[in-house]
C-alpha cells in the first residue's frame, strides 16, 4: 500500500513547528518518527472526507491540538530516554481517529499499543493508518471499553492507559483502571480542571483501586489553551463488578453514593 507523503506546500510556520519538538516537549524524534508524524495530517484529512473524524482541519491547529497535545501527556510517565526503552503494553481508550494512540506509538516504539474504540468505521480507518505507517507493533480493536475491561485476557494486563476527549474523569477511570496491572498508570487528558471534579474522581478511585498521583497544568504552545493531564496509578486490584455493563458508567458515574 502506497504511503502518503507530507504536504509539499506547508505554511512556513508549520515547517518551524515540525522542528520544535525538542524545545516544546524535550523530545527529539528520529527521521523516521518525524516522517510518520508528518504523514498523519494528509491521511486524516483524506479520511475526513468520508467520515467525521475531526473538526480540526487547519494544519497548524492539527499539529498543536492532535500531535503536540497527544505527546505532551506522555511526559508524566518519566523522561523520554527512560520511557522510550520500556517494553510496555499500552491502551488508548476511545481512540477515535487515532489520538493520542498513534502519536504515542510513534514516540514509544518499544510499547505495544491497543487502540480501542466502539465504532467499527473509525477502527477500520485506524487499522489502515497503522498499516500505512508500518506501525506493526500496534493493533486497533472495535469494542466497548466496558466489555474489554471484563475480558479475562485483557483485564489487568496493561502497563499504561490513555484517555483523551472521551468522558468525565471518573468515567475514564472506570474504563482504564480495570485494564491496568497493579502499579500500572493512566493518563487522563483534560481541559480545565476543578476541585469539584477532583473530589468526584477521588471517590471513584477509592472504588476502583486507584490513586491520583499528579495533576499537571500547562498551556499549548501556539493558542495558549489551558490543559491539564492527570496521572493515576493502580494501587490495588479493581473489584470484579468494574467496569459495569455497557453504558452504565456514563448513565451513573461513580461517586460517594454510587456503589454496585
Swiss-Prot record:
One of its GO terms (molecular function) is rRNA (guanine-N7-)-methyltransferase activity. InterPro entries: rRNA_ssu_MeTfrase_G, SAM-dependent_MTases_sf. Residues 237-246 have a biased composition (Pro residues). GO terms for cellular component: cytosol. It is found in: Cytoplasm. Residues 236-260 are annotated as: Disordered. Keywords: Cytoplasm, Methyltransferase, rRNA processing, S-adenosyl-L-methionine, Transferase. Its EC number is 2.1.1.-. It comes from the Bacteria. S-adenosyl-L-methionine binds at residues 94, 99, 117-119, 145-146, 164. Belongs to the methyltransferase superfamily. RNA methyltransferase RsmG family. Specifically methylates the N7 position of a guanine in 16S rRNA. This is Ribosomal RNA small subunit methyltransferase G. It comes from Synechococcus sp. (strain JA-2-3B'a(2-13)). The lineage of its organism: Bacteria, Bacillati, Cyanobacteriota, Cyanophyceae, Synechococcales.
Amino acid at each position: 500500500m502506497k504511503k502518503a507523503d507530507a504536504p509539499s506546500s506547508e505554511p512556513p510556520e508549520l515547517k518551524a513547528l515540525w522542528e520544535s519538538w525538542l524545545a516544546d516537549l524535550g523530545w527529539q524524534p528520529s527521521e523516521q518518527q518525524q516522517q510518520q508524524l508528518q504523514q498523519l495530517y494528509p491521511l486524516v484529512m483524506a479520511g475526513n472526507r468520508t467520515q467525521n473524524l475531526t473538526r480540526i482541519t487547519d494544519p497548524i491547529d492539527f499539529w498543536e491540538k492532535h500531535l503536540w497535545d497527544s505527546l505532551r501527556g506522555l511526559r508524566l510517565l518519566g523522561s523520554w530516554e527512560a520511557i522510550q526503552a520500556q517494553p510496555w503494553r499500552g491502551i488508548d481508550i476511545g481512540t477515535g481517529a487515532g489520538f493520542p494512540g498513534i502519536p504515542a506509538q510513534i514516540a514509544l516504539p518499544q510499547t505495544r499499543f491497543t487502540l480501542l474504540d466502539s465504532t467499527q468505521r473509525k477502527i477500520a480507518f485506524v487499522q489502515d493508518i497503522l498499516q500505512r505507517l508500518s506501525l506493526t507493533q500496534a493493533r486497533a480493536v472495535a469494542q466497548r471499553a466496558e466489555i474489554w475491561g471484563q475480558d479475562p485476557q485483557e483485564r489487568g494486563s496493561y502497563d499504561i492507559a490513555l484517555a483523551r476527549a472521551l468522558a468525565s474523569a471518573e468515567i475514564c477511570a472506570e474504563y482504564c483502571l480495570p485494564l491496568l496491572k497493579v502499579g500500572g498508570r493512566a493518563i487522563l487528558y483534560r481541559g480545565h480542571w476543578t476541585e469539584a471534579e477532583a473530589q468526584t474522581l477521588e471517590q471513584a478511585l477509592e472504588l476502583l483501586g486507584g490513586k491520583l498521583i499528579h495533576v499537571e497544568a500547562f498551556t499549548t504552545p501556539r493558542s495558549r489553551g489551558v490543559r491539564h493531564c492527570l496521572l493515576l496509578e493502580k494501587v490495588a486490584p479493581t473489584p470484579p463488578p468494574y467496569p459495569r455493563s455497557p453504558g452504565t458508567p456514563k448513565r451513573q458515574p461513580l461517586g460517594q453514593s454510587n456503589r454496585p
